[in-house]
Amino acid sequence: IGPREVDRLWSRHLLNSVAMANLIAPSATLLDVGSGAGLPGIPLAILRPDLKVTLLEPLLRRANFLTEAVDELGLQDTVTVVRGRAEEHRQTYHVVTGRAVAALPKLLGWCLPLVAPKGQLLALKGESAERELLEVHGILIGRRMTGEVVSVSAHPLAEPTWVVRIR
């Protein structure tokens, strides 16, 4: 998130991040791939203290920032920061999230191995959600998985957030 995004911090980034909270089962384990500034993982951890959240970030500078943020916010009991790449990570989770990481075909390759049986991938997407879901239709059929685009909103006045849900 750069300086030009300050005016849209709440609507585009924070509310956008928590909009998917109702799609996540109670007490789920959640992996935020390419966590960057901690979105959506940190806002979800604050809103949903029942979740066990892992923030996965390959860049040292960002991973250090995330560790400081988790400590400052007092989230050490529910949030873990891991420096690493999705394709090298081996643990599985009930929910894997991706926001502004990659196009859906690439994101699936990195994230599907990290989704536990009966788990789900929640990818925050913009208006490209339907198109990207069509691009991966064959992959999902081959894996006996389904995908849908869900429009969710954290607040009645907020812009809708488009989530591609893969299960």
Region annotations inferred by a language model:
Residues 1-31, 47, 61-75:
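Class I SAM-dependent transferase core
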Residues 37-50:
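Conserved SAM-binding loop of SAM-dependent methyltransferases across substrates and taxa
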